[in-house]
Swiss-Prot record:
Catalysed reaction equations from the record: [[Fe-S] cluster scaffold protein carrying a second [4Fe-4S](2+) cluster] + N(6)-octanoyl-L-lysyl-[protein] + 2 oxidized [2Fe-2S]-[ferredoxin] + 2 S-adenosyl-L-methionine + 4 H(+) = [[Fe-S] cluster scaffold protein] + N(6)-[(R)-dihydrolipoyl]-L-lysyl-[protein] + 4 Fe(3+) + 2 hydrogen sulfide + 2 5'-deoxyadenosine + 2 L-methionine + 2 reduced [2Fe-2S]-[ferredoxin]
GO molecular function: 4 iron, 4 sulfur cluster binding; lipoate synthase activity; metal ion binding
Cofactor note: Binds 2 [4Fe-4S] clusters per subunit. One cluster is coordinated with 3 cysteines and an exchangeable S-adenosyl-L-methionine.
Native source species: Shewanella loihica (strain ATCC BAA-1088 / PV-4)
Transmembrane regions listed in the UniProt entry: none
Cell location: Cytoplasm
The EC number(s) this enzyme carries: 2.8.1.8
Requisite cofactors: [4Fe-4S] cluster
InterPro entries registered for this protein in UniProt: Aldolase_TIM, Elp3/MiaA/NifB-like_rSAM, Lipoyl_synth, rSAM
Family: Belongs to the radical SAM superfamily. Lipoyl synthase family.
Name of the protein described by the UniProt record: Lipoyl synthase
């Protein structure tokens, strides 16, 4: 039996190459078997794309990445045109192979020590008042990338003292306490970590992750920073039931999470997990009502909702769906 080919630093693996060695194999979808998107899931393109071009040019100029582009988010045009972007630090190559996600897998390069300053300058030039910072998983780093998050927060606030910063962090597998100790030096305004799906579906959707670890990360941060909102996001359409999602919501509240995003999973390519169901808007509304009933201070629930979709409005408690 031949040994797997050694990953080369900086080389992006996508689609079939990315998911070739995950526990639950993904059978490439045939067009005939793929569910047809309902009319209420169509994305509306903005009338002008100049703002989109400007943001992309600013990112390229400074060698920065957005999760909007790297993960092929369907809301890219709307968010860029709105003047918002979710910056992705620590490169564009993830050490995990989650088959729902379109971010490339591989062996990442060493973190760019200049990225925190370049990010802060770009945010200043874009005159942003609210930013979301996320990252790929960096299991190759001793702290999982926590110090780089802290460095970015510090530099952003130096140049943008009035800004609000939300961070969407990985699970810091096996390094939670060390990572939180580092983040305590430069805490964000909102702490976000996505559970993504119900625990029953972790093996196929989040290989390498652990449902309880993710809950513990959220709870421990909240215990250390009781005044900072905690947030998590979930997808629907991977085979879960509404009751399974409701149970996750109860788990999140039991771990003191206050903000929620809930959206429809969309298959990035035929090599990714298939969409098993398109969830009607009315069911999202029902889950939103339930989330608020059990104590979430804000719940953004709808087919096109994503974790950082209009995050500034979410943080203000405004309706997002």
């Amino acid at each position: 039996m031949s040994r797997p080919e050694r990953l080369q630093p900086g080389v992006k693996l996508r689609d079939a190459d990315k998911v070739s060695r995950i526990p639950v194999k993904v059978v490439p979808s045939e067009r005939e078997t793929m569910l047809r998107k309902p009319d209420w899931l169509r994305v509306k393109l903005p009338a002008s794309n100049q703002r989109i071009v400007d943001i992309k040019q600013a990112l390229r100029k400074n060698g920065l990445h957005s999760v909007c582009e790297e993960a092929s988010c369907p809301n890219l045009a709307e968010c860029f045109n709105h003047g918002t972007a979710t910056f992705m630090i620590l490169g564009a190559i993830c050490t995990r192979r989650c088959p729902f996600c379109d971010v490339a897998h591989g062996r990442p390069l060493k973190p760019d020590a200049e990225e925190p300053v370049k990010l802060a300058q770009t945010i200043r030039d874009m005159k942003l008042k609210y930013v979301v910072i996320t990252s790929v998983d960096r299991d190759d780093l001793r702290d999982g990338g926590a110090q780089h998050f802290a460095d970015c927060i510090r530099e952003i606030r130096k140049l943008n003292p009035e800004i609000k910063i939300e961070i969407l962090v990985p699970d810091f597998r096996g390094r939670i306490d060390a990572a939180l100790e580092i983040l305590a030096t430069e805490p964000p305004d909102v702490f976000n970590h996505n559970l993504e799906t119900a625990p029953k579906h972790y093996r196929k959707a989040r290989p390498g992750a652990n449902y309880q670890w993710s809950l513990d990360l959220l709870k421990k941060f909240k215990e250390q920073h009781p005044h900072i909102p905690t947030k998590s996001g979930l997808m629907m359409g991977l085979g879960e039931t509404n009751e399974e999602i409701a149970e996750v919501l109860r788990d999140l509240r039991a771990h003191n999470v206050e903000m929620l995003t809930l959206g429809q999973y969309l298959q990035p390519s035929k090599f990714h997990l298939p969409v098993e169901r398109y969830v009607p808007p009315a069911e999202f509304d029902e889950l939103k009502d339930y989330a608020e009933e059990i104590g979430f201070t804000h719940a953004a629930c709808g087919p096109m909702v994503r974790s950082s979709y209009h995050a500034d409005l979410q943080a203000q408690g405004k309706e997002v769906k």
